[in-house]
Amino acid sequence: MSRKRTSPNRNVQIADQIQRDLSELIMREVKDPRIGIVTIQSVELTPDYAHAKVYFTTLTGDPAATQQALNHASGHLHNLLFKRLHIHTVPTLHFHYDQTIEKAVAMSRLIDEANATRAKDDDEADAPAKDD
């Protein structure tokens, strides 16, 4: 008996739809004051669509408090997604703060510091030595 396999493309399509719908639902339906301006960066689905890791960033407020509030509202968001999505299983939502931007800024800062140090060392090496 052959099993029907879902294509990886379907997984990506559903993740993208969940990302779009969650962005709108969080903005319009969630009234928790701990949730400021939130951007859903990406959604990762398990192959069986049972769980979804939702990565977000926030412009205002504490990321930890926002994550706690979003995870608290995940049941309500799950129910709202169920009404919008036409799939058999709507995944359980798990919200995670996306630190990619902070890590990129820190890495860029380290690179800038290394370049400045190298330029300073090169300038000192090129300077003529003083005779006493």
Swiss-Prot record:
Statement: the UniProt record of this protein carries the keyword Iron: no
GO cellular component, as recorded: cytosol
Sections of the chain in a coiled coil: none
Cross-referenced InterPro entries: KH_dom-like_a/b (IPR015946), RbfA (IPR000238), RbfA_dom_sf (IPR023799)
Pfam families: RBFA (PF02033)
Keywords: Cytoplasm, Ribosome biogenesis
Statement: the UniProt record of this protein carries the keyword Amino-acid biosynthesis: no
SS bonds (residue pairs): none
Family the entry assigns: Belongs to the RbfA family.
Subunit structure: Monomer. Binds 30S ribosomal subunits, but not 50S ribosomal subunits or 70S ribosomes.
Functional summary from the UniProt entry: One of several proteins that assist in the late maturation steps of the functional core of the 30S ribosomal subunit. Associates with free 30S ribosomal subunits (but not with 30S subunits that are part of 70S ribosomes or polysomes). Required for efficient processing of 16S rRNA. May interact with the 5'-terminal helix region of 16S rRNA.
Listed name of the protein: Ribosome-binding factor A
Record organism: Burkholderia multivorans (strain ATCC 17616 / 249)
Gene: rbfA
